[in-house]
């Protein structure tokens, strides 16, 4: 299997590669959505 791609901790990020290699979120925001969905954005409208 793909090393890391199947890891729930990184959620294979947004591009299909382990985001953990560049710092988990690294400002990408892709992995952040997986563990922390943008609730304030939808509830603020």
From Swiss-Prot:
What Gene Ontology molecular function terms does this protein carry?
hormone activity; toxin activity
- Full protein name: Natriuretic peptide OsNP-d
Propeptide-annotated positions? 1-5
Listed A to Z, the keywords are: Disulfide bond, Hypotensive agent, Secreted, Toxin, Vasoactive, Vasodilator
What GO biological process terms are annotated to this protein in UniProt?
A: regulation of blood pressure; vasodilation
Family to which the UniProt record says this protein belongs: Belongs to the natriuretic peptide family.
Compartment(s) of residence: Secreted
Q: Name one GO cellular component term.
A: extracellular region
Tissue expression pattern:
Expressed by the venom gland.
Which positions form S-S bridges?
Answer: 14-30
The record's function comment reads: Snake venom natriuretic peptide that targets both NPR1 and NPR2. Exhibits hypotensive and vasodepressor activities.
- Which coarse location class describes where this protein primarily resides? secreted
Pfam families given in the database record: ANP
Which InterPro entries does the UniProt record give? Natr_peptide, Natr_peptide_CS, Natriuretic_peptide_brain
């Amino acid at each position: 299997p793909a090393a890391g791609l199947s890891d729930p901790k990184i959620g294979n990020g947004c591009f299909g590669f382990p985001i953990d290699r560049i710092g988990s979120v690294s400002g990408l925001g892709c992995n952040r959505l997986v563990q922390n969905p943008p609730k304030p954005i939808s509830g603020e409208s």
